[in-house]
């Protein structure tokens, strides 16, 4: 027997049930028991965050920098700013601006933003306090910690951005290729 007149040979779209707070999906796709729907987060997942390589008050880990920061914090800040800005802000410019703000008591407003950028770049916690508080209350300690952190990540703030780039290029050129064998 044939089809009744007026019906086509097209398949009807099937309705799929989705899990929502108001309905439950069973293993066979129908409404019923709740299904084990993955959320994308493993059961034993713990979000980890990198830690600062040194504590806030570990200034004597780099005593030379500690003395420079105590005498002329604008120098340390300028070095940090040049590295964090990837050379866009020269050390002297950042240092002079910091120095001018230092005498008004507002240098922390400028400097804490660089701490926040360092934290973001290296995935560091906002510790021991929010960046602006750390810079307001413990400015020289914060600058020393940031300087040490940059060194920990392979930067030499004394060289500036261009010096670090040049040093990295020289090291790259001197690194022997891996995975090659001698033929012969």
UniProtKB/Swiss-Prot annotation:
Q: Where is the composition biased (Polar residues)?
A: 1-26
Q: Where in the cell is it found?
A: Membrane
What segment(s) does the record annotate as region Disordered? Answer: 1-33
Q: What InterPro entries does this protein's entry cite? A: PLAC_motif_containing
| Cysteines paired by S-S bonds | none
Recorded superkingdom: Eukaryota
**The keyword Transmembrane appears for this protein:** yes
Q: How does it sit in the membrane?
A: Single-pass membrane protein
Respond yes or no to whether keyword Nucleotide-binding is given for this record.
no
Tell me one Pfam family matched here: PLAC8
Q: Where does the chain cross the membrane?
A: 94-114
Ordered alphabetically, the record's keywords are: Membrane, Transmembrane, Transmembrane helix
A cellular-component GO term for this protein: membrane
Q: What does this protein do?
A: May be involved in heavy metals transport.
Which family is it part of? Belongs to the cornifelin family.
This protein is called Protein PLANT CADMIUM RESISTANCE 5
Organism (species): Arabidopsis thaliana (Mouse-ear cress)
């Amino acid at each position: 027997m044939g089809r009744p007149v007026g019906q086509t040979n097209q398949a009807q779209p099937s309705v799929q049930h989705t899990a929502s707070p108001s309905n439950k999906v069973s293993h066979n796709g129908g409404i019923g028991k709740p299904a084990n729907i993955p959320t994308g987060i493993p059961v034993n997942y713990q979000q980890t965050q990198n830690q600062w390589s040194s504590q806030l008050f570990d200034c004597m880990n780099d005593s030379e920098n500690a003395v420079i920061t105590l005498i002329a914090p604008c120098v340390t800040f300028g070095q940090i700013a040049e590295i964090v800005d990837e050379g866009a802000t020269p050390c002297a410019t950042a240092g002079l601006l910091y120095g001018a703000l230092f005498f008004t008591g507002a240098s922390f407003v400028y400097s804490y933003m660089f701490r926040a950028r360092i934290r973001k770049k290296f995935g560091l916690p906002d510790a021991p306090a929010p960046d602006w508080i750390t810079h307001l209350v413990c400015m020289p300690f914060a600058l020393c910690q940031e300087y040490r952190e940059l060194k920990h990540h392979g930067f030499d703030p004394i060289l500036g951005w261009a010096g670090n780039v040049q040093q990295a290029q020289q090291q790259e050129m001197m690194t022997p290729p891996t995975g090659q064998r001698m033929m012969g």
